[in-house]
Amino acid sequence: MLEQMGIAAKQASYKLAQLSSREKNRVLEKIADELEAQSESILNANAQDVADARANGLSEAMLDRLALTPARLKGIADDVRQVCNLADPVGQVIDGGVLDSGLRLERRRVPLGVIGVIYEARPNVTVDVASLCLKTGNAVILRGGKETCRTNAATVAVIQDALKSCGLPAGAVQAIDNPDRALVSEMLRMDKYIDMLIPRGGAGLHKLCREQSTIPVITGGIGVCHIYVDESAEIAEVLKVIVNAKTQRPSTCNTVETLLVNKNIADSFLPALSKQMAESGVTLHADAAALAQLQTGPAKVVAVKAEEYDDEFLSLDLNVKIVSDLDDAIAHIREHGTQHSDAILTRDMRNAQRFVNEVDSSAVYVNASTRFTDGGQFGLGAEVAVSTQKLHARGPMGLEALTTYKWIGIGDYTIRA
């Protein structure tokens, strides 16, 4: 089965690579329209997936990721339209010039070919990835989690209908709907057909892909994100940022998981934090230094376990640790961070600059929420993933991350001397 999917995807990629921007946008507009027109079938399929997942004991955080609402589905369709409005990088001349030999040389952006994406209970990923791949002239093979099987099938059917109505092969967007995990291992060895693999899931999936894949892998999306509260920070403003970074949508990878508090601001800051977190329904996991103060406040607080500093809670839970200074905060982030998104809240711009320079994450913020690490927020449109590695992409992966380049030499029967 996968062999045939690979062949179909590779053949479709050749056709997609030749499309103009106008032709690709026409397909995307059709997909967005059909997602709204056929929303009832998609939402019904999703409701069945959610019911089964709840019966099987899926966590509330994962259920939130899985669930679609009419508003969320409309947002997904609008994201596709946003991709239409983005500049098409394919065909862009990056640089070039004329050599001494007279050969005119240019480096031009081209599609990667076929993208493989493995993901869990995130039905929006199906459309986000498909739209970005189509915009950049790439075919895609999707393997969603078993929790999303009905939703993905309904969504991909809509996308394939839109492709066919525009005269394009359905093989441009395909999904593996068999939940057999053995197919994941088989997919990881499809280097004959798949040019780049993107796993979007937990650490176990990433480890599996790194160890078994014969295809280049882009990993990321695991977000043990930190906020460091410097001693000069303005407490009222800090609380606004923390509420946003923790509670806006706790199940996302750019949600803050650990708060590092400078010891010189702890006495005045922790009581205010406890009050605010109690109002927000957040459970605090505090180190010994913070626990004594927080236990007298209104927020629910427990003693932090050492391993929780490495946890991506994806829930209304927040680690709180008192640190001696900026050096201590940076050392903690280096040990426990996942190079996703980390922030400093401060009025000391020298400390801010040190934090930016010394924290080696894909996104680093000064006086801002970690929740901004998102393709839409960065103006990239919907994202394929957030890469936390350094090759070949880093941070939110938009259109350019789905391209490579080729060198083109144009001569007049030019030969090398």
UniProtKB/Swiss-Prot annotation:
PROSITE patterns: PROA. GO terms for biological process: L-proline biosynthetic process. One of its GO terms (molecular function) is NADP binding. It is an enzyme of class 1 (oxidoreductase). Pfam families: Aldedh (PF00171). It is found in: Cytoplasm. InterPro entries: Ald_DH/histidinol_DH, Ald_DH_C, Ald_DH_N, Aldehyde_DH_dom, G-glutamylP_reductase_CS, Glu-5-SA_DH, GPR_dom. It comes from the Bacteria. GO terms for cellular component: cytoplasm. The keyword Nucleotide-binding does not apply. Pathway: Amino-acid biosynthesis; L-proline biosynthesis; L-glutamate 5-semialdehyde from L-glutamate: step 2/2. Keywords: Amino-acid biosynthesis, Cytoplasm, NADP, Oxidoreductase, Proline biosynthesis. It catalyses: L-glutamate 5-semialdehyde + phosphate + NADP(+) = L-glutamyl 5-phosphate + NADPH + H(+). Its EC number is 1.2.1.41. PANTHER family: DELTA-1-PYRROLINE-5-CARBOXYLATE SYNTHASE (PTHR11063:SF8), GLUTAMATE SEMIALDEHYDE DEHYDROGENASE (PTHR11063). Belongs to the gamma-glutamyl phosphate reductase family. Catalyzes the NADPH-dependent reduction of L-glutamate 5-phosphate into L-glutamate 5-semialdehyde and phosphate. The product spontaneously undergoes cyclization to form 1-pyrroline-5-carboxylate. NCBIfam families: PRK00197.1 (NF001221), proA (TIGR00407). This is Gamma-glutamyl phosphate reductase. It comes from Escherichia coli O6:H1 (strain CFT073 / ATCC 700928 / UPEC).
